[in-house]
């Protein structure tokens, strides 16, 4: 056992607590020396300076030539212009008032019925952020019921429509797309809209857009007279959009306090602006990531919240951390292949699953435990074994069992889970991601890999159309013949397209064996 991981002095020396936030951060079970901290401390003057430039409105997403302003959303006074600050404040108040009007029934559907449900259509941060909000904070029988379409899986879409069948007339359809051109929400929106129209159900008067002004979605919502349009600023990225209208509207519609959510995030932002290293939680957390991974992401991040309501948090962090830090090049154009892989579920469930490997298997990770001190106000546990005490015991036991094998971990403790503390927790990780990116000299706010994937997908969709058009002309074609007519470099994608299009589909006659692609000959019937 590494005695350093169980040093009481180290624990006391590096434990961070803020009495305004009632959050603790313990990095003592990360292996490092005081000299390591001194070395990093010297770098943090430049880190804080870079973050300050970002907050002042510097162009931080170079690829898209835009500012990065999600920190302004929770403190409009620091935005680079009074116009931006006033717009943010107006948006927040508009969302709050709209939520009240929906919940108290002042805004109803065309049949004068109160709305009961929300079908949220968004992908990436536009889906994960709202899902985290509702899963973490929605209380029984409060606000509207939420369902999500965050993919173009045909089964998902059909199942959601089936689940909401009797309630579609009282369902708000919220479509989130900053540009309005993202294929997944657009396709899902068109399917849902068509379903409503084909079944004599309202779409336009039940539909809400969250998008940029003058985007394709904005113009569509205007022309079709949708119920509402909420602003999504150009300088807000998807993975950091949770304190924008993307996260605030769900809060308002589940009858939670959006101002407390913003206040928690704002106070955490403020706590991370101090130049006092040991009193800066984002400096401590990002340094722990840096030290345990040798500054090159050698270890995966395993997120273990010991509360079911935070189960989605690990998925949320997957996008926030991996999309921000997974970069091939640093700012000097050098190949660095940076990144931290993130996975997790919840405790104590994971103690009966992969924690076995964490303790006894390959040592390629660090854990982030998240614990809460509160418990529900109820008498159902009186005279019974207290589940809260057991849950705490399981967390401490797992933490101890890991450290006994020199496995590293971080522990974050919240007094309770509410709008305020969730806002603060999210802000802590957002700031830590920014700090880490500065430490390793990468841009946290571009996503060239995502854009490359989108372009490749667009190419495949183009090939799908070309294959379909070719088969419509009639005649038999082998894969080699099809590729020679379309693009000789894409034989494998053509095989995948044909399998998706033709396997089990009686509209096509297929000769040959699917296990031998070169033997396949395909013809469209009746063509």
From Swiss-Prot:
Keywords: Cytoplasm, Gluconeogenesis, Glycolysis, Isomerase. It catalyses: alpha-D-glucose 6-phosphate = beta-D-fructose 6-phosphate. GO terms for biological process: gluconeogenesis; glucose 6-phosphate metabolic process; glycolytic process. InterPro entries: G6P_Isomerase, Phosphoglucose_isomerase_CS, SIS_dom_sf, SIS_PGI_1, SIS_PGI_2. It is found in: Cytoplasm. One of its GO terms (cellular component) is cytosol. The active site is at 323 (proton donor), 352, 454. Pathway: Carbohydrate biosynthesis; gluconeogenesis; Carbohydrate degradation; glycolysis; D-glyceraldehyde 3-phosphate and glycerone phosphate from D-glucose: step 2/4. One of its GO terms (molecular function) is carbohydrate derivative binding. PROSITE patterns: P_GLUCOSE_ISOMERASE_2 (PS00174), P_GLUCOSE_ISOMERASE_3 (PS51463). Its EC number is 5.3.1.9. Belongs to the GPI family. Catalyzes the reversible isomerization of glucose-6-phosphate to fructose-6-phosphate. This is Glucose-6-phosphate isomerase. The gene is pgi.
